[in-house]
Regions:
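Short acidic, Gly/Ser-rich segments with clustered Asp/Glu that frequently serve as metal-coordination loops
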Residues: 183-188
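Carbohydrate-associated surface elements
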Residues: 180
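Alpha/beta catalytic barrel-like cores
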Residues: 1-176, 189, 193-213
Length: 217
């Protein structure tokens, strides 16, 4: 089915105008130039760190081709346009690998907001988050290996569990499917065990309301 769709460019690119397709082709030709990409990345990172006014330039060039927006409301025009062709969207707040408790709490709050938003929008069939958006990778690894935790680590893991509980509970109450994205294999055992407990708790009344994504080799 998918092969037939993409063999028919009139269907595959029906949401794009000729000028948008020309722009996309030009952009991918630039990206294919490795030295240019290295230089562009370095210049962009410097400009952002120096707080230079480059956001408008980024939005006008590469941003719109790869991103739907910078917020839920900002993504709405793109999501609504795609939904007219039967294409759904997922707002993936793909923060991962952080080390700070404030960042973990911020990721949880953003996920809660996305669940609330998904409840209202037919074009968003589910919400998703990454395990290391809610806790340290090293902590997941230690828990998965059944290594002993000190007092502070026990408290830290309790906070991770509480974040999972908060988003799973809201997803259940709002009847929004929730996916937990798989990450590195060496931390996945702890995430799998925690998600399984959440599935056992919240998937009793409705099948597949909470879904774990597994790592495959």
């Amino acid at each position: 089915m998918m092969e037939k769709i993409f063999n028919n460019t009139q269907v595959a690119f029906s949401l794009k105008s000729d000028s948008e397709l020309d722009r996309a082709y030009f952009l991918f030709k630039l990206i294919d130039n490795e030295p240019l990409v290295r230089i562009g990345t370095a210049v962009t990172n410097f400009a952002l760190k120096a707080h230079l006014p480059v956001e408008g330039l980024i939005r006008a060039s590469v941003f719109d081709h790869f991103c739907g927006g910078v917020s839920e409301d900002d993504c709405m025009p793109v999501m609504e346009k795609m939904f007219t062709k039967g294409v759904c969207s997922v707002l993936d707040y793909s923060v991962e690998g952080k080390e700070d408790e404030h960042q973990f709490d911020a990721a949880m709050k953003k996920t809660l907001k996305i669940i609330e938003f998904a409840k209202l929008i037919d074009a968003i069939p589910f919400a998703v988050f990454k395990p290391t958006g809610f806790g340290r990778l090293d902590l997941y690894t230690k828990v998965g290996n059944k290594d002993p935790l000190n007092f502070e680590e026990h408290q830290e893991w309790d906070r991770v569990v509480a974040r999972y509980e908060a988003v799973c509970k809201l997803a259940f109450e709002k009847e929004v499917a929730l996916l937990i994205d798989a990450e590195e294999s060496w931390m996945q055992d702890a995430a799998d065990e925690l998600v399984t407990k959440m599935m056992q708790k919240y998937n009793k009344e409705k099948a597949q309301e909470l879904v774990n994504v597994f790592v495959t080799n």
